[in-house]
Each structure stands twice: as structure tokens, then as C-alpha cells.
A protein has these predicted regions:
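C-terminal catalytic "cap/lid" subdomain
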Residues: 1-252
């Protein structure tokens, strides 16, 4: 970081650089993929120990729900790093989840600003505030995800079963998003935005998993996530939420 700051200092008061472009382990030019510009800005800000990182986009910040789907969604003016990470990871597209970690580790605030309303404060993401009350901050959703359900009586308390299963996902280059488990079932979700999930890949994965369990693919699916602090302490207050899932016959 010190060498980087010294290099930056030689450039004068302002440095204009590109995002999205990086180098791989062998030093060859590569691209960071979706959200690469957000990630570049966050990494540069963290390395420089910047006062803040500002991401300018076409929306004023993060909302309590998708405003295109929920017109009464509220703009969230303040979030801590963990809350923002969860909202971004579970469906919000305004900020890539990968861009939050560098700022969190360097304790650099991250601001989301609106290019069409430059005087608007937007959303400020920073350290958790002391005494933050438990509560639901946002509802996020993802669509088009793939569920892989794995059943087997023998999996209960079988040493190494999950390690064996996830090794097979790794073998096929698949990263798991959400996980649900019971005594005789493990269900995981695959996000197509982070994985190459086509019929050929799923067919090979199922053939591999069939060696250790019964497997079923369910797609397309959607996930709905409640994001907040101290959620376990609020379970007794979420009866209306759970009832809404029941009315719509949504599996939990």
C-alpha cells in the first residue's frame, strides 16, 4: 500500500484510471467481470486509505425493497457493511457484493450517489453503529435461481457427507449460494449470475451426485430474503410475514 500511495502521489491532485481491468496470477491482462468497476473503486480507495469511496450510478442508493416492484420502498440513508453486503448478495443490483469487503477491511465509508441528483446524499455504508436496534432493514429477492435437492437416509450424521457433496460442486466449477438442511435432505441454490448453469452442466453434476444421494433439480425458482439485525430475537414478531408466505403457498 505504501508503494501504491507513493505512485499515486506522483500523479498530482487527481488521477483518472479505468476500472474493470486487472491482471491474473500470471500477470496477464484480465477482466473482473460483473461489478468490476465498483470493485476497482473499492480496492483503490482501500489501498489509498481514502476518506471515502463514492459510487455514482443511476439510482439514489439502496432501498428497503426493489422500488420497481414495491413503489412504497424507502431509501436507506445509512447501512453498516454487513447489512449492505447481505442486501447486495441477495438481489440488489445497485452495488456488487464484492465491492464492499475492501472498504469494510480498510474501514473506508462507501457512498452510493445519484448522477442525476448530485446534491442528494444517497446511501452511506460504514461501520456498525453502537446501540443499533434489532429490526428488518430490507426485503430483497432473486429470480431465475436453480435449486438442487439431495435426499438420502444415510446422510444423517454421516461423517464427511457434506464435504463429499460440496467437493462435487467444486469439481464442476459451481459456487453454492443458499443452503437448507434437515436430517435426510440438503438443498442448495445456484445463482446463474455467478455460475455457468446450463443443462449440460446440471446433467453432469446430477450424475456425479447420484453416486452418494438421490438428486432433483428444481428450476426456475426465486428467493426472498429479510435482511436486518437481531433477526432471531424478532421471530415472534414475524408471524404476519410468515402468514404472507403461507397465503401465497411459498415453500420455506
Amino acid at each position: 500500500p505504501e508503494g501504491f500511495r507513493a505512485l499515486y502521489a506522483k500523479q498530482g491532485d487527481s488521477l483518472i484510471t479505468q476500472g474493470f481491468i486487472c491482471a491474473d496470477a500470471s500477470g496477464k491482462t484480465a477482466i473482473l467481470g460483473r461489478g468490476g468497476s465498483d470493485t476497482s473503486a473499492a480496492c483503490l480507495g482501500a489501498l489509498l486509505g481514502a476518506e471515502r469511496v463514492e459510487t455514482w450510478t443511476d439510482v439514489p442508493g439502496m432501498f428497503s425493497a426493489n422500488p420497481r416492484q414495491v413503489p412504497q420502498a424507502r431509501l436507506l440513508s445509512r447501512l453498516d457493511y454487513e447489512e449492505a453486503q447481505e442486501i447486495a448478495s441477495t438481489g440488489a443490483k445497485v452495488l456488487h457484493p464484492r465491492s464492499i469487503s475492501p472498504c469494510r477491511e480498510a474501514r473506508v465509508p462507501l457512498w452510493i450517489r445519484d448522477t442525476s441528483r448530485p446534491d442528494f446524499e444517497g446511501t452511506v455504508i460504514g461501520p456498525r453503529q453502537a446501540g443499533a436496534a434489532a429490526g428488518v432493514k430490507a426485503i430483497s429477492s432473486k429470480s431465475g435461481i436453480v435449486l438442487v435437492s439431495m435426499d438420502g437416509i444415510g446422510m444423517w450424521q454421516q461423517v464427511g457427507f457434506l464435504a463429499d457433496v460440496f467437493e462435487r460442486f467444486k469439481r464442476h466449477g459451481l459456487s453454492v449460494d443458499l443452503i437448507g438442511s434437515s436430517e435426510a435432505n440438503v438443498t442448495v441454490s445456484l445463482d446463474p449470475s455467478d455460475n455457468l448453469v446450463n443443462s449440460d452442466v446440471l446433467e453432469r453434476l446430477c450424475a456425479d451426485l447420484a453416486e452418494v444421494c438421490r438428486v432433483k433439480v428444481i428450476a426456475p425458482c426465486a428467493s426472498i430474503t429479510l435482511v436486518g439485525r437481531g433477526m432471531r430475537s424478532l421471530l415472534h414478531k414475524l408471524s404476519d410475514v410468515l402468514a404472507a408466505f403461507g397465503r401465497e403457498r411459498v415453500h420455506l
